[in-house]
Amino acid sequence: MDRIRIVGGNKLAGSIPISGAKNAALPLMIASLLTDDTLTLENVPHLADVEQLIRILGNHGVDYSVNGRREKQNEGYSRTINFSARNIVDTTAPYELVSKMRASFWVIGPLLARMGEAKVSLPGGCAIGTRPVDLFLEGLQALGADLDVDTGYVIAKTKNGRLVGNRYVFPKVSVGATHVLMMAASLAKGETVLENAACEPEIVNLAECLNAMGARISGAGTPTITIDGVESLSGARVRVIPDRIETGTYAMAVAMTGGDVVLEGARPELLQTALDVISQTGAEITQTNSGIRVKRNGAGISPVDVTTAPFPAFPTDLQAQFMGLMTMAKGKSRITETIFENRFMHVQELARLGAHITLSGQTAIVDGVAKLKGAPVMATDLRASVSLVIAGLAAEGETTVNRVYHLDRGFERLEEKLSNCGAVIERISA
């Protein structure tokens, strides 16, 4: 099993290209199931989750080509991929595929809307709390779907061959359920109004994609989304937005180690709250013609309290990284997690590097230390794993991060990007 070796203490300097957002690419890829024309997606990152979803879509009969050919492309970073779901051969998403990645459950919406039926295994992915799919199922039922859960599968069928538009109020904000219902309602009969919908930039990117395919969606990016269903959707060419989580992660790495880095292609409006918080820690963040410049000189790291919440607030997917940054702040900070109930699994691993962190319910109290010391650590999930990398970059001596397959799910060529900016970091194959 691969691991990453880091020798800390080096400032970062140079530029890092920001890849396409995984959390935007996955629903756009799934949207290809809604049409028998070709959907071309630009700026798709080369990640384990993307490759897994390609396999899942292939199981349904979706063909793909990367920049005009099927072979994987290793040069460059994000890619252009063509998806063709002209011939859906199977509406079942089996456990052995879905269990490896939670977002693959989302195929239930497009399959149900276009084919009138779907049988999808209950999902897997990062083991962060329970993350139930109740909202997905309630929403699809509101659109007229008949649902049954049997032996770990959700079996869904439409009445009279087509979903029917309706008003649905999400009991709590859910990005995944908003994605699924927006896709499903695009082919439903009549108007659907989604209230208390997620407002994340990835929702807006999906709405832009669906509208380019011929859907009639308004209000994406606000709590109320209106979808006027159409008979069919066509192909389109759409660009995946830059990854705001990757942007925030590298910005925090610079804030922690010091240095001066331009994050090429980053869009500040996608994570303004997080950038404001990073600025409060003492980093200088400015917009450039090509992205965002992050700079921190010799001044220490100031402690800042944060609470995770849905967009536009501080994102839960940056909580672990920010905790890594706060481990070396000059004073105490409080980090409160409101999205997931079990997202502090990185605390004990940061403690192995010398961090002082105590937990009180859903709040972590971080008492900053003058220095961290390298040690072997174990990644527990995607975002926790990169928080250990950030901490390792600033720690004295050598840090080894094990279970880096978590990193490969969400960060494109991370060690290469950091190494190009002066970090001493390498992947060691088992």
UniProtKB/Swiss-Prot annotation:
Functionally, this protein is described as follows:
Cell wall formation. Adds enolpyruvyl to UDP-N-acetylglucosamine.
From the UniProt record, give the pathway where this protein acts: Cell wall biogenesis; peptidoglycan biosynthesis
**Residues involved in phosphoenolpyruvate binding:** 22-23
NCBIfam families in alphabetical order = murA, PRK09369.1
Under what name is this protein listed? UDP-N-acetylglucosamine 1-carboxyvinyltransferase 1
* In-chain residues carrying the UniProt-annotated modification 2-(S-cysteinyl)pyruvic acid O-phosphothioketal: 126
User: Taxonomic lineage of this organism?
Assistant: Bacteria, Pseudomonadati, Pseudomonadota, Alphaproteobacteria, Hyphomicrobiales
Assigned GO CC terms: cytoplasm
